[in-house]
Amino acid sequence: PFLGKDLKKSNLEKQNITFGYADRFDEKYDLVRSVRKGKYKYIRNYQPFNVDGIYNFYRYKMLAYKEWYSLFKEGKLNKIQSQFFLPRTPEALYDIEEDPHEINNLAKLKKHKETLLNLRETLNNHVVSQPDLSFFPEPYFLENGLENAVDFGQKNKKIIQSLVETANLNLYPYKDVSSEIKNALENENPWVRYWGLIVCSSFGIDAKEHLNKINSIFENDSENLVKIRAAEYLLLNNLKIDSSKINNLLKNAN
């Protein structure tokens, strides 16, 4: 019955593609989308600097998590066991039949490039066509789109597409997209700037050439949520930042 009146089991069994979606679980926020076709699963980590073991209060009260993380900090885990606490790649590709636990990322192997690009395009088209409302920060959506999410999405479809295009800059070598990142950071739309900063954090210290602009955004941007993303870049890369201003940002958070 959960399939609904218009979906028959016979039609469902003909499907060879499944989309996956993850955003927020309690205070743990991440933006991950996936698509599986046949035996291959493609995962898009839009914020790859996040780790799978990102903090959740309740789970780090669990003894197993505590021990796992302690062993990681002590350097006692092997490469596979450590993956849970390390930054990810912007995209990943897994052969689910051979690797059901999604350990061996095939995304950078030449022999899988065609599969990677096909699934990347499939997922991107899906994200844009919905459109995916999570490319707006959650507080903004709650204030502006919650009353009628469908109408909000359709009215903002072109804007969401531009946000997705900005987010996708972290799929390419930094030198190839540096100028586009600069344009994003200077864009009049605050959410393009927001995603430009996330892309900078994806590239880490390689994006340091934009540091003056990032500092300017942190100090002067009109949107508090954009300032927070600028602070995120500075903190992730151990760059100088006024901690008192961080406190003010948090006090003014939506």
Where are the predicted features?
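Long, internal low-complexity/basic segments
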Residues: 75-90, 98, 106-212, 216-253
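Glycine-centered flexibility sites
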Residues: 4, 38-39, 201, 235
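Active-site proximal loops enriched in glycine and acidic residues that flank catalytic Cys/His/Asp
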Residues: 21, 44-46, 131
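C-terminal, low-complexity/hydrophilic appendages and adjacent surface loops
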Residues: 25-108, 115
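Generic structural hydrophobic/aromatic packing signal, biased to beta-strands
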Residues: 7, 19, 35, 42, ...
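Generic structural signal for secondary-structure transition and capping sites
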Residues: 12-15, 40, 128, 132
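Short secondary-structure boundary segments
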Residues: 1-13, 56-74, 181-182, 215
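Polar, surface-exposed loop/tail segments
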Residues: 1-37, 112-121
